[in-house]
């Protein structure tokens, strides 16, 4: 005898989706911060290298 698997109750599904959305938005914001930070760092190093290069030349 096969017991049909009932889908999750709507309230539970809503709660889990909300939590997932919150978590994903947090992760996305963290990624954006990381990307910005790395971009700033690379820009800084590029500027320093460029200044050194110009000074050498």
Curated annotation (Swiss-Prot):
Superkingdom of source: Viruses
InterPro entries (alphabetical): DUF5466
Protein's recorded name: Gene 19.3 protein
Gene behind this protein: 19.3
